[in-house]
């Protein structure tokens, strides 16, 4: 299963970007034996729409397009799965998150898209299409830190699925 991260906004050079790249590199190396291929990060420009509703709709359109491209030609069990990061989402532990990623892979999903929304959050239509709306705890995180956290959790999920001792429960 190809795993992509879609993030609204750019991450500038600096220590945060280096840390994100380090964890995504680890995930890219740990994933293939488990059937998880890291396909990279797609940065979506922040919308300049006049209202929050318009901005969310414009940002969601690009994620919809990626999902449609992944699902074209697929069956209901194939295609793409979507996880949205949202402070109002479900809070999971690392082992539960790893189990969900593993189940999506085992169910024959060809692609997993993890989407980090813009400052206004996600469009309601996109939220309703998501397979999982996930909160990274009850705190609100800047987008740069959310990227670091999901990069680390994807790597951790791969190590959990592999039985590697990185994760100590």
From Swiss-Prot:
Q: What is its EC number?
A: 2.1.1.177
Q: Where does S-adenosyl-L-methionine bind?
A: 85, 117, 136-141
| Catalytically driven reaction(s) | pseudouridine(1915) in 23S rRNA + S-adenosyl-L-methionine = N(3)-methylpseudouridine(1915) in 23S rRNA + S-adenosyl-L-homocysteine + H(+)
This protein's major location comes to cytoplasm
Q: Name one GO molecular function term.
A: rRNA (pseudouridine-N3-)-methyltransferase activity
Output the Pfam families linked to this UniProt entry. SPOUT_MTase (PF02590)
Q: Does the entry feature the keyword Methyltransferase, yes or no?
A: yes
CDD domains in the cross-refs: RlmH-like (cd18081)
- What cellular component GO annotations does this protein have? cytoplasm
Q: Which UniProt keywords apply?
A: Cytoplasm, Methyltransferase, rRNA processing, S-adenosyl-L-methionine, Transferase
Top-tier EC class = transferase
Annotated localization: Cytoplasm
InterPro entries in the record, alphabetically? Alpha/beta_knot_MTases (IPR029028), RlmH-like (IPR003742), tRNA_m1G_MTases_N (IPR029026)
Database matches in NCBIfam families: PRK00103.2-3
According to its UniProt record, which protein family does this protein belong to?
A: Belongs to the RNA methyltransferase RlmH family.
Q: What does this protein do?
A: Specifically methylates the pseudouridine at position 1915 (m3Psi1915) in 23S rRNA.
Q: Which HAMAP family match?
A: 23SrRNA_methyltr_H (MF_00658)
Its quaternary organisation is:
Homodimer.
Q: What is the protein name stated in its UniProt record?
A: Ribosomal RNA large subunit methyltransferase H
User: Source taxonomy lineage?
Assistant: Bacteria, Pseudomonadati, Pseudomonadota, Alphaproteobacteria, Hyphomicrobiales
């Amino acid at each position: 299963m190809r795993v992509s991260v879609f993030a609204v906004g750019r991450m500038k050079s600096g220590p945060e970007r280096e840390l994100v790249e380090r964890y995504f590199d680890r995930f890219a190396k740990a994933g293939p034996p488990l059937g998880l291929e890291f396909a990279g990060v797609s940065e979506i420009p922040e919308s300049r729409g006049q209202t929050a509703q318009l901005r969310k709709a414009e940002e969601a359109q690009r994620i919809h397009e990626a999902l449609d491209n992944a699902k074209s030609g697929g069956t209901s069990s194939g295609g793409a799965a979507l996880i949205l990061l949202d402070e109002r989402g479900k809070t999971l532990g690392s082992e539960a998150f790893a189990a969900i990623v593993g189940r999506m892979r085992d169910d024959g999903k060809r692609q997993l898209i993890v989407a980090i929304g813009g400052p206004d959050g996600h469009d309601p239509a996109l939220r309703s299409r998501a397979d999982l709306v996930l909160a990274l705890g009850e705190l609100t995180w800047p987008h740069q830190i959310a990227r670091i956290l999901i990069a680390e959790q994807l790597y951790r999920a791969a190590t959990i699925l592999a039985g590697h001792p990185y994760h100590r429960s």
